[in-house]
From Swiss-Prot:
Changing D296N: Loss of activity. Plasma. Secreted by macrophages (at protein level). Glycans are attached at N423, N433. GO terms for cellular component: extracellular region; high-density lipoprotein particle; low-density lipoprotein particle. This is Platelet-activating factor acetylhydrolase. Changing H367N: Reduces the association with HDL particles. It holds the Pfam family PAF-AH_p_II. It comes from Homo sapiens (Human). Induction: Up-regulated upon monocyte differentiation toward macrophage lineage. Changing M117A: Reduces the association with LDL particles. The active site is at S273 (nucleophile), D296 (charge relay system), H351 (charge relay system). N-glycosylated. Macrophage-derived PLA2G7 carries sialylated complex-type N-glycans that hinder its binding to HDL particles. The gene is PLA2G7.
Length: 441
């Protein structure tokens, strides 16, 4: 879910070369990482190359948005998620976007770069916040529909806040799962209760696969991811029922306020890329999810048996520049005359238009790193979010005004393509090469 490795290296090493054009081999990186002047030069350089907004957008709905982290069961078999929800308090501090240095180290590992790259990323983005009120109380007096969200390969629970915040601002509770299948750049757990009590984290980093492992391991991972989505749903419904559940994280958020807060008949699953495949796997296994939305799904991890086992409505929202024939053909395997299936493509969009990194840089660097497409990032995410809301209203039976965007589900907008821009008529196209990595997420 992060940009191609060579583009990142070119950009960031170029930044360093401008700041320190001479005697690079003699620089002590640790000493210079601690230099505020060095940091300021890098940040100024990045800003000068940005020429645009670099903030994650606020939700467009009428609700104030709160945010907290929940870990149920401190082990790596438990559930870890970031929760976005309608809030009654708008005076809290914004939420830190990437909360631990280890996540930046995980991103550098995913990029296949030196650990120093993680520290550079931390310097550039470590203080960035999202417009959600940290640990704010839940807005009482309503039962809210629930969305479980699944992140892409190399991502983690915090990197889709623009989607989570917008849904919460329209009256949803959103549980963004952090997967423990080692497809996240990084995640953590506690080895035992005493470690949890003192905050002694044990970190899991992305698993690097050999080519011959791809098919088997990716399928194992998508199955685990689906179970983690279902497990997250079960635990939230337990809390909604009033079951006492201890948050392994020492946070000032009273989970009892979630009691009787969920509309248990209005539950959906959404995911991006590897998370899009997770949506499909989850729908095939858990009928409690009434519908699903797959954002630029990466279909390779799914087994062939899944496609005929999805009775729920399913909506594919694709980017223009990521998709390819083999992937679209697999999406169309989900189609059946008696099942609700929709697909649209956002013109001028790239794979990263669905993730927060598209808002973390301005135009020039954003295009260099393929974090931004030809379409404005705010326009792209707005189209995706509005189309999602219209689909959710239709299939969850919501009494809202989201049907004003029903036309988007059909691709009726100048920035949308109904269906796909990909030609799949050439049947000689090989559906997937032996490694399955011709289009990574």
């Amino acid at each position: 879910m992060v940009p191609p490795k060579l583009h990142v290296l070119f950009c960031l090493c170029g930044c360093l070369a401008v700041v320190y054009p001479f005697d690079w081999q003699y620089i002590n990186p640790v000493a210079h990482m601690k230099s505020s002047a060095w940091v300021n030069k890098i940040q100024v350089l990045m800003a000068a190359a940005s020429f645009g907004q670099t903030k994650i957008p606020r939700g467009n709905g009428p609700y104030s948005v709160g945010c907290t982290d929940l870990m149920f069961d401190h082990t790596n078999k438990g559930t870890f998620l970031r929760l976005y929800y309608p809030s009654q308090d708008n005076d809290r501090l914004d939420t830190l976007w990437i909360p631990n240095k280890e996540y930046f180290w995980g991103l550098s590992k995913f990029l296949g770069t030196h650990w120093l790259m993680g520290n550079i990323l931390r310097l550039l983005f470590g203080s960035m916040t999202t417009p959600a009120n940290w640990n704010s109380p839940l807005r009482p007096g309503e039962k809210y529909p629930l969305v479980v969200f699944s992140h892409g390969l190399g991502a983690f629970r915090t990197l889709y806040s623009a989607i989570g915040i917008d849904l919460a601002s329209h009256g949803f509770i959103v549980a963004a799962v952090e997967h423990r299948d080692r497809s996240a750049s990084a995640t953590y757990y506690f080895k035992d209760q005493s470690a949890a009590e003192i905050g002694d984290k044990s970190w899991l980093y992305l698993r690097t696969l050999k080519q011959e492992e791809e098919t088997h391991i990716r399928n194992e991972q998508v199955r685990q991811r689906a179970k983690e989505c279902s497990q997250a749903l079960s635990l939230i419904l337990d809390i909604d029922h009033g079951k006492p559940v201890k948050n392994a994280l020492d946070l000032k958020f009273d989970m009892e306020q979630l009691k009787d807060s969920i509309d248990r008949e209005k539950i959906a699953v959404i995911g991006h890329s590897f998370g899009g495949a997770t949506v499909i796997q989850t729908l095939s296994e858990d009928q409690r999810f009434r519908c699903g939305i797959a954002l630029d799904a990466w279909m390779f991890p799914l087994g062939d048996e899944v496609y005929s086992r999805i009775p729920q409505p399913l909506f594919f929202i694709n980017s223009e520049y990521f998709q390819y024939p083999a992937n679209i053909i697999k999406m169309k395997k989900c189609y059946s005359p008696d099942k609700e299936r929709k697909m649209i493509t956002i013109r001028g969009s790239v794979h990263q238009n669905f993730a927060d990194f598209t808002f973390a840089t301005g135009k020039i660097i954003g295009h260099m790193l393929k974090l931004k497409g030809d379409i404005d990032s705010n326009v792209a995410i707005d189209l995706s979010n509005k189309a999602s809301l219209a689909f959710l209203q239709k299939h969850l039976g919501l009494h809202k005004d989201f049907d004003q965007w029903d036309c988007l589900i059909e691709g009726d907008d100048e920035n949308l393509i109904p269906g796909t821009n990909i030609n799949t008529t050439n049947q000689h196209i090989m559906l997937q090469n032996s490694s399955g990595i011709e289009k990574y997420n």
